[in-house]
Amino acid sequence: MTEKLKQGIDQLGLKVAETIQQSMLAFLAFLQKWNQAYNLTAITEIKSMITHHLLDSLSILPYLKGDKILDVGSGAGFPGIPLAFACPEKKFTLIDSKAKKTAFLLQAASRFKITNVTIIQERVGSYQPGFYFDTITCRALGSVREIMEQTNHLLRSGGQWLIMKGAYPEKELRGTDASAIVHVLNVPGLKAERHLVEVKNNKG
């Protein structure tokens, strides 16, 4: 499994220290254990988790900007946890409305000493942190427009949304911000289509 992750990271053109890669794999084993009782993810094998969770999450790393990142609907921690592992200099806030998921994330952050993450259990529309984020990430949670509307109050002017999608979201992009750019993501070992919708916040 170590070699599979290393090869995948190399294919993505990223540099992640081996110690960090080992922590990522340990996190997956921890998730697998919790998943038996709490059903946090439908993907249960470590090999598949590496592809569908770790490498999929890390594929958006080149597009990450700023120091304050909000991961919306973080669930079992994707893409927030892998990104936090890879970018210890950035501050990540992971928000989810479900108690069992935030409980897992709190335990994981403590166990693996992920000191650059803050875990919040709340609906994102009600979240008022008192500051703005530079980037908002989201995977598998609602349409592009819905995500933008629910989180607009949290993103600074000039900041960006990075919304992860499967197939090209043509219908979702109709009527949304004209500054949307869609990147094709090539995730090593993943045959399914993956796209990243990047939208800049042009509010004054």
Curated annotation (Swiss-Prot):
Q: Which UniProt keywords apply?
A: Cytoplasm, Methyltransferase, rRNA processing, S-adenosyl-L-methionine, Transferase
A single GO cellular-component term from the record reads: cytosol
Q: Which InterPro entries match?
A: rRNA_ssu_MeTfrase_G (IPR003682), SAM-dependent_MTases_sf (IPR029063)
| E.C. numbers | 2.1.1.170
Binding site residues for S-adenosyl-L-methionine = G73, F78, R139
Named from the GO MF annotations, one term is: rRNA (guanine-N7-)-methyltransferase activity
- Which HAMAP family does this one have? 16SrRNA_methyltr_G
- What is the protein name for this chain? Ribosomal RNA small subunit methyltransferase G
* Source species: Coxiella burnetii (strain RSA 493 / Nine Mile phase I)
| Gene encoding the protein | rsmG
